[in-house]
Curated annotation (Swiss-Prot):
Gene source species: Synechocystis sp. (strain ATCC 27184 / PCC 6803 / Kazusa)
The name this protein goes by in its record: Protein sll1483
GO cellular component: outer membrane-bounded periplasmic space
Keyword Signal on entry: yes
InterPro entries registered for this protein in UniProt: Adhesion/Biosynth-related, FAS1_dom_sf, FAS1_domain
Keywords of the record: Signal
Length: 180
């Protein structure tokens, strides 16, 4: 029952966020796919969750998505744009943070953090320009594009445009935390 409620809430947030302004088109250099992504299966027939699960670099993210019961929602049709922190990004959080977030009593907080990394629609690196866009958590993400590099809040996109059947993944070097 809780999973169904989460899916309904997730769908409602998606609908709400789709009504918000989206990132406009702009020219920018596309970041070359790095070794981080070359390990992933980038078959566009796979969902965002399947692509992430197929890459050890995202094992902490995948564990968090499972703990938050977001696998089904992020495997839905979408499309979604996911800013995916690497294992190193999670490891840079203060000691004990990840372990604490994975506890059942912190599930709502984990859902908010994870949905803060997701934007409705498929936004490629070439479409990003400086400005704000609403995340599925209902909070705005701030984008800055400078010298062909994209920053999302304080995180840097280190690999862009990893295609999936239900959207696109951009790999980031930090976990971005929503206002709590």
């Amino acid at each position: 029952m809780k999973t169904a409620a989460r899916i309904v809430a997730f769908t409602a947030l998606t609908g709400f966020a789709l009504g918000m302004p989206t990132v406009a088109m702009a020219e920018m250099e596309t970041t070359e796919k790095s070794a981080v992504v070359s390990q992933a299966a980038t078959d566009s027939a796979m969902t965002i969750v399947e692509v992430a699960a197929g890459n050890e670099t995202f094992s902490t993210l995948v564990a968090a998505v499972k703990a938050a019961d977001l696998v089904e929602a992020l495997s839905a049709e979408g499309p979604f744009t996911v800013f995916a922190p690497t294992n190193d990004a999670f490891a840079a959080l203060p000691a004990g943070t990840v372990e604490s977030l994975l506890l059942p009593e912190n599930k709502d907080k984990l859902v908010k953090i994870l949905t803060y990394h997701v934007v409705p629609g498929k936004i490629t690196a070439a479409q990003v320009q400086s400005g704000e866009v609403a995340s599925l958590a209902g909070e705005a993400l701030t984008f800055k594009v400078k010298d062909g590099k994209v920053k999302v809040n304080k995180a840097t996109v280190i690999s862009a445009d990893v295609d999936a059947s239900n959207g696109v993944i951009h790999v980031i070097d930090q976990v971005i935390l929503p206002p709590m």
